[in-house]
A protein has these predicted regions:
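Intrinsically disordered, low-complexity terminal regions
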Residues: 1-263
Length: 263
């Protein structure tokens, strides 16, 4: 169990060939890394855990598990479980071939590129999260976020910066947006629980679109449903000059309904 003195936030780079990664950020002055085989009875997993490299120098943490070219139907890829405890506000970069990535606590910028697996981020200064197959969930992001998945859903609970979200097949949900949002999916619903300011560009080919606008915010609408209904449930407000904030909404769906409401 490697342990390093880290009185300040670190820059962590993790390369995982197969298995799960859990990053936990807290107010602490050290960094602890634990690596275990996913299956302690698998010789391949045990060997992969033993060969996983953990290095630290000058504020930079490097964790790298061995890559094996073996095909899944010939026994599968060796798998490890990595648990990292580090100082809050640390920067995290992850590259993963197969496995879930879970980040807890308050982090700096977080960048995750995965082929297969879910991505969960508790709180970050900024987010880049992409997976080919899996869900992306962000509880809170203080800055901008870019998230995408080919097959899976995307959910952001609160964003203070701008969002760019895209999925080929899956729903996109933002509970509260304080900045602009661009959200596109081919097959799925797009839902913004509450928009405060900025612009919303919401598009889906097959699915409903819903946008909630905070009380006191004026809204400019440009919406169209090719085969569906458009419902504007906004309560009247004064002109834009009287509103606290303004949001511009452009919503499109080929097959589905569009609902714009107060939130």
């Amino acid at each position: 169990m490697p342990t390093f003195d880290t009185p300040a936030p670190v820059h962590a780079r993790v390369d995982v060939s197969g298995g799960s990664l859990r990053v936990r950020a807290a107010d602490r002055s050290d960094t602890v890394v634990e690596v275990h085989p996913s299956d302690p009875h698998s010789s391949a997993d045990v060997q992969a855990a033993q060969q996983t490299r953990v290095e630290y120098a000058a504020g930079r943490l490097l964790i790298s598990s061995p890559r094996r070219p073996r095909l899944h139907f010939f026994g599968g890829m060796p798998s490890v479980e990595i648990d990292v405890c580090l100082p809050a506000d640390s920067v995290v970069e992850v590259s993963s071939l197969a496995g879930d990535v879970d980040c807890e606590g308050r982090l700096g910028d977080v960048r995750v590129d995965a082929r297969y697996g879910d991505i969960r981020i508790d709180r970050a200064a900024g987010v880049h999260a992409r997976t080919a197959a899996g869900d992306v969930t962000v509880a809170a992001v203080d800055g901008d976020a870019d998230a995408g998945t080919a097959y899976g859903g995307i959910r952001v609970h609160e964003a203070r910066g701008d969002l760019r979200l895209d999925s080929s097949c899956g729903d996109i949900t933002v509970d509260r947006a304080l900045g602009s949002v661009g959200a596109t999916t081919r097959y799925g619903e797009v839902r913004i629980g509450q928009a405060v300011r900025g612009s919303l560009v919401l598009e889906t080919a097959y699915g409903d679109v819903e946008a909630g606008v905070r009380e006191g915010t004026a809204a400019w609408l440009d919406v169209a449903a090719g085969s569906g209904n458009v419902r504007n449930l906004l309560t009247p407000t004064g002109g834009p000059e009287d509103a606290e904030e303004t949001v511009e909404i452009r919503a499109r769906t080929a097959y589905g309904d569009i609902v714009i409401r107060r939130a």
